[in-house]
Amino acid sequence: THLVWSLPGGVSKGITEEERKQILEMAKVNLEFAKFALKLFEDVVLKNQSYVDLILSDAYQTVTNYMGLVDRQNKVNFYDGMIRVVDTEAKEIDRFKPADYLQHVKEHVEPWSYLKFPFLKKIGWKGFVEGPKSGIYRAAPLARLNVADGMATPLAQEAYEKYFDTLGGKPVHSTLAMHWARLVELLYAAERQLELVQDIEITDPKVRIIPNRTPDEGVGVVEAPRGTLYHHYKTDEKGMVTKVNLIVGTTNNNAPICMSIRKAAQGLIKAGTIVTEGLLNRIEMAFRAYDPCLSCATHSLPGQMPLQVSIRDSQGEILKTISRG
């Protein structure tokens, strides 16, 4: 997942015309695959009302603010632009340059987690609560579509419009809609790849500008698959890194993930509910949607994810514990 030819000021090698032609053919295949994936989603999921009802069910709704990178036309962008934040009604409440992120984002700490909980500085930390008064935000495919006014490529724009038409307009708060949003982005990425590889400047041999001074501080932001990714570095007079601050995609979503798990558990487990393996799977769905990597990062060697659910009564006493993994 990490580029091996990145250097200060650029990259170590450009692409040749022969390589460009190979990439062009790959891009065509990628575009067809993206269209196929969306068609498959439509045929298997959208044409099955029970699946649509599951996506829209209250157990998987988490009402938050949203953050994402947009271009000058407020279209989704993965690498450049401004950070845009919208509220629970999809109204813009903040907009800032990536380098100014510390003026807009703060992190809350809980004693039971190594991972911090980012929130919007202008609203403040109000706890693990949903709604318009909460400072919690989400950053992921769902968020990127919610903060944007559209997609920068034609087919992805059509898919974007269908997404919101089907799910009732903006913003979409359904956690399970994350999968559909990811497919819309896949189509955009494939179209964009095809555009870039046909650009006449793509084979320009000038791929690096040697830095002429020692850096002292830098902030970089991209949209990773799991959300907005902030990298912040400070260096000494020799260019050695002395301080690093990272807010990665999963960290942005830490509080919403916790809230989504709680919401799913509360929505699925009622008085008299028999807790089964299938019910554990449906709770698990609430956080796997945030990032495909969570499916890999939270499992044991045999392939099962270690999960424990404790059922408590109104007094907080544990009535039953179910675990696996």
Tell me what each language-model feature is.
Residues 219-250:
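Active-site and channel-lining beta-strand-loop segments
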Residues 1-226, 250-325:
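Active-site bordering "gate/hinge" segments
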